[in-house]
Structure formats: structure tokens, C-alpha cells
């Protein structure tokens, strides 16, 4: 009896560990676009309270009030609307011909059913890289310590002054602890 209990407890611990690990791996990954998103969108990333849509040379941030969504789901909220906001960051004069690639494919996938088609086996990736967003400058987007980060990789003999980012739709913009 003791051995059975120890085995059961061990299996339960293993199951919980695998479940938590699978959950953490599926969070914050780049979803490929196989037709379930608008053509201009290369990848979508779910973040707490919204999503980020990545296009060539542009990020579109879309956020909603998570508490209101939960209240609507729980049939507590009477209003038919949810507070939401979108804004964008566009890399001005970026090269439209740049190559975008996803790397480190996960085993996780989703299927989508739109009004026009069924999209199967949509995969998720850990990293997105846009080569030559500017001449000699690459953009790499990834997660670090549970935060979405991006690096602009400036290759030798490249001009960093090419980089110009225009923000649109936000209420205000400021630096806090040297972060935007």
C-alpha cells in the first residue's frame, strides 16, 4: 500500500510538473500566420491583457481590460462593451523587402475555423527575427524573464541613425528607469 501511495504521489507530482512546464512554454510564443490573421500580420503574440501583432517594420499593440472580460465571462458584467486600446510602433523607412523568420518551433499548435476556411496545425515559436529591417540592422524579438524584449542588432559599418520609430495611438510616452 505504501509503495502504491508513493508511486501515485510521484506520478501526480510529475503530472503537475509537466503541466506547469507545458503551460509556461505555451505562454508568450510567436504564432505563425497561415491565413487565420490578416495578410499584413506575420506573427501574433498573446500577452497579459492583449496581443501584439508583428508586421514587417511595425508592431501593433492591442490591449483590453482583463477584469471586464472575466466579469463578462462570469455573467457579472451588464455592459455590452469592454474597454480596449490599440497603438503602434512603426520603424520609419524600414526595408519592406526584409526577411522575417521564426525559430525554435514548439510542439504546441492550434487549429482555427474562420468563416472562409479552416486553418490547421498553426505552430508557435520562441523567437522572431527580421533581417535587414534597415541596411545592416536586424531586429530580434524574444522573451527574457517573462518580458517581451527586442534587440536591434547593428552590424559593423552600419549606420544606427537609420533607426526611427514612430509611435501612434498611445495616450502619452515617457522614459522610466531608462525604459520606454
Task: Please state what every model-predicted region is.
Residues 22-180:
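Extracytoplasmic/secretory N-terminal segments
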Residues 1-27:
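Bacterial Sec-dependent N-terminal signal peptides
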Amino acid at each position: 500500500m505504501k509503495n502504491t501511495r508513493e508511486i501515485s504521489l510521484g506520478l501526480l507530482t510529475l503530472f503537475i510538473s509537466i503541466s506547469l512546464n507545458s503551460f509556461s512554454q505555451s505562454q508568450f510564443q510567436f504564432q505563425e500566420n497561415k491565413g487565420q490573421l490578416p495578410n499584413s500580420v506575420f506573427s501574433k503574440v498573446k500577452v497579459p491583457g492583449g496581443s501584439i501583432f508583428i508586421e514587417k517594420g511595425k508592431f501593433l499593440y492591442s490591449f483590453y481590460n482583463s477584469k471586464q472580460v472575466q466579469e463578462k465571462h462570469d455573467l457579472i458584467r451588464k455592459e455590452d462593451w469592454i474597454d480596449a486600446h490599440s497603438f503602434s510602433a512603426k520603424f520609419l523607412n524600414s526595408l519592406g523587402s526584409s526577411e522575417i523568420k521564426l525559430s525554435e518551433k514548439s510542439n504546441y499548435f492550434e487549429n482555427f475555423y474562420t468563416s472562409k476556411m479552416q486553418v490547421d496545425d498553426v505552430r508557435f515559436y520562441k523567437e522572431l527575427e527580421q533581417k535587414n529591417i534597415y541596411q545592416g540592422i536586424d531586429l530580434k524579438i524574444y522573451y527574457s524573464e517573462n518580458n517581451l524584449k527586442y534587440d536591434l542588432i547593428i552590424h559593423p559599418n552600419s549606420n544606427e541613425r537609420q533607426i526611427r520609430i514612430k509611435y501612434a495611438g498611445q495616450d502619452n510616452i515617457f522614459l522610466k528607469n531608462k525604459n520606454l
